[in-house]
Each structure stands twice: as structure tokens, then as C-alpha cells.
Amino acid sequence: MSQSNPLEIRSDRDPLYGWIMVGVVFILSALAFGALGSISVFLKPLATEFSWTRAETSLGYTAIALSSALFGVAWGFVADRFGTRWFGVIAALVMTASLYMLSKQTSIVHFYAFYFIYGAFGNALVGSPLFANVAYWFRQQPGLAIGITAAGGAFGQGIVPYLAGIMIEGSGWREAYMFMACGYLIIALPLGFLVRESPVRLRAMQFPDDQPRTFPLKETEVLIWLSAAVLFCCNCMSVPIVHLVPLLTDAGQSLSSATSVLMVLMFSGVLGRILGGKLGDVIGPLPAYLLMSLGQTVFVLWFPFTENLVTLYVLAVFFGFAYSGVMSCILMCTRMMVSPGFAARAMSITSFFGYGGMGMGAFVGGLLFDMNGN
């Protein structure tokens, strides 16, 4: 009698709970990445009150990126070994506590420290480890499922900064952080208890030496190439994400108008991530990635030369679609090229270089402003 592969999925129908996981991780990543994107809205009020430079304040974004990158790799090892059952709960509590403490900050050391904690024990937990989890719930059109899940980050980076801008204008930056902390606790904590590990990854933990993989390159070679690609793509995308709102307000736009442009950029990114994942199902993850990466590179060049608000909205739509599609395609490339039991580590390692690129781009953008005054 032949022995069946323990990792084989015995039904062509994807588990219904996989779609519940898509919804859960969509919302958790929306909250996690939303606070990351909202730094651009808090940048000028904090710099004005504490007399910080743009470069110093922009390092708050770098603090999240750095801690998410470093701790994300560690959480990837934990996820591949023990699963992600409690990742959502821990992240919900830490994100809430960090935002609350940011409302009480009195120095730039506090600012960096609380955002570092937010990234290390909040954003890092609901990022790559949970994306790897969701990726293996699906056998039919995994790109679409991954794209919808990844769209949560773009949605959050659109709505959270916009709401933060309204709260800052109405009540001040301290109250805005406080309101965000309360909202995160109410929304994220119940969802955290719904996180479950995918059946494929559970089998991979039970049978680590018997995992199907067809991609010709070694997993280490795959990681080197993907990490290099992600480093440069994220360096490019982080500059408008962090500095678009200050750029527009410096040009005479109101804070609400500037944040609405960022919101349009991120909401178009929701569609970009979904269709980017679907495109990966149709033409393959790697060709889809190349197409989306080319798009973001072309569109980002036009932001400094565009002043008309309507034209800015149009540019935001195109850039948001392209840059967000990059993330879905990278996740699909990783899923295609590595084994299930290595997926969380692989996605976390590529994310490490992604966050490094985003942190570098955010700081360099602020530094160039300080050097040139625009």
C-alpha cells in the first residue's frame, strides 16, 4: 500500500475558515499599518511643538520600520515552529498600549521608544507571520486571497491617517493618539482571538522533512534575490508615504486636503493589492511583480512637479495602485518559491529588507528636505 503525502490537501475546496482569516488579518493589518502611515500626519504638529527637525521626526517611522524588521524575523522563526495562534491578541494589546503612551510623550526619546515597541510587538506580529498563515489556507486562487489580505494595510494607511488628521485638527495630537488607542483596543482585541493556523502549515510543523516544493532555485538563493528587490522597491515607495502630507501642506494645501490625497493613494492601493494578487494568479507572480514595480518607479517621479489638487488625486490613484500591487506580488512570489514550513521565516526575512528600505527612504526624504528646504 502506498503511503500518502502528509502535506497533501485532500479536497479541492478551500476551508471556509480561510476566508474568515482573510477578514481578520485584513483588519488587523489595516490597524497596524494605519498607525505606521499616520506618522506623516503627526509629523508637523510634533515638530512644531517640540522644535524637532523633519529628519528627527521622520525617524519615528524609521523606528517602527527597524523594529518591525528585526523582530519580524524572530517572530517568523516562532511562527514556523509553534504557529501564530496568539499573535493577534499580543499585537492588539501592545498596539493599544503604545498609542496610549505616545499620547503622554514628552521627549523625542519617548517618541522613538514607543514607536519601536509598537513595531516590535505589534506590527511585526500581524505582518509576515499572519500573511504566511493566510497564504496556505488556499489552494484555489491563492493570489486573490493574499491580495485581499494585503489590501488591509493599504486600507488602513488610507483611513487611519485621514481620521488622525481630523482628530488632530479638532482636539490636538495628544487626544488623537488617545482616541486611536481606545479604537484599537475595541476593534483588534476580539479579532485577535479568532486567529487559527492553516491546515497545511500545521502539517508542515508535524512533518518538517516532507514538504512539497517545485521551484528550481534553493530557498536561500530565492531569499537573496527577493530581499534585494524588496529593499529598493520599498526605499522608493516610503518617500511619498511619509512626506506627501508635509509636501502638500508646505505648498499651501490644508491638512485635510493633504490627508485626503494620501487617503486616495492608499484606497487605490486596496484595489492594487487585490488585483496585483489576482494578476499573479493569471500571468504568474514574478511577471506581475515586475510590472507593478515599473509602474511605481514611473509615477513617483511626478509628485514634486504636480501642484493642482485634481491632478494630485489622479497621480495618487496610479501610484497607489502600482506600489500596493508590489506587496501582493512579492508575497505570491515567496509562496510559490519556498516550502510551507519555511514560509513565515521567508516572508519575515524579505520584510526585514522591505522595512529597511522604507526606513531608509523616510529618513533620506526628511534629510534632503532639511538640506534643501523643499
Task: Enumerate the predicted regions with their spans.
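Intracellular juxtamembrane helix-capping segments at the cytosolic ends
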Residues: 46, 124-138, 325-338
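Interfacial helix-cap and linker-helix signal at transmembrane-aqueous boundaries
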Residues: 46-47, 78-79, 159-172, 176, ...
